[in-house]
């Protein structure tokens, strides 16, 4: 609900809008006509703190509700207000792939710049496959991997992102806290700047994740922040010929052979980059380490 309250600019004495602002209802109608264009919303936010506050409270919320109406309705159901105050971060997550940096969050050897994504589909079913069996009553929406092909030794890299419903009361958060998993020492969420937990370090990445993401086993890593934003990386398996496909437990999916169409040594390098160690490697789900150390 739009409150009929007048605000004064708190940006600076030299701000050009010191003589008052347009009514919020007028701005709402203007941006509704513009279909909640995210670039224009971001531009308006740079004008002054009053516009920035209005964009965070109203415009980004309307953008999210328009871009993913069913998902937003579910995230706010059952009295859940966990995304209140984070609409801008959620809006960015819907349309922006954060990429990865060399030696950054994912300890990757490639540099993939962040970029906007024209169209993204978020799936609750895909999110469920990324959760361990004991946590599958949690609700997680995850997008299909954003494909970045031919990344040298890394192969075909997939970057994905998602959002938990009511993360503060989720079983995943409870498991992470019970296992005393530490926050990442330096990296933060690219969407809300909150601290991050590694779900690989928490040992709660199920085998079903690689099947549903069509990625190599042991080459998947994802993090979740305090606000429930999830971001991850995987090495995508190449499409297999029909005779090479291995049926999985899920009749709707097939598991790809790791030695078909893609050098196995690159798979091992990617796995060792995530898990650290020799070619045989340590058991899966070990904490990320730098193989050069």
Swiss-Prot record:
Bias type Basic and acidic residues, positions: 250-259
Ranges for region Disordered: 245-293
Database matches in InterPro entries: EID1-like, F-box-like_dom_sf
Residues of the F-box domain: 16-68
Signal peptide: none
UniProt protein name: EID1-like F-box protein 1
Origin species: Arabidopsis thaliana
Record gene name: EDL1
